[in-house]
């Protein structure tokens, strides 16, 4: 499983994809910002290795 799950929370909770590194997360965020003319709120949730689930309650906003 990938380390991060990436979402756009601007209008709902759209999953953008999964990434292993923060560089990949930032690339997804840049692509989403370009596709939506900046009307997005991209966040990422880190994988909890103990449960195999993503910690959405502890998500981090991705700064572009």
Regions found by a protein language model. Give the residues of each.
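Short aromatic-glycine-(Arg/Gly/Cys) micro-motifs in beta-strand/loop hairpins
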Residues: 1-15
């Amino acid at each position: 499983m990938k380390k991060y799950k990436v979402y756009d929370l601007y209008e709902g909770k759209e999953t953008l994809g999964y990434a292993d590194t923060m560089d990949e997360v930032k690339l997804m965020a840049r692509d989403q910002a370009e596709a939506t003319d900046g009307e997005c709120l991209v966040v990422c949730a880190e994988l909890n290795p103990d449960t195999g689930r993503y910690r959405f309650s502890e998500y981090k906003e991705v700064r572009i």
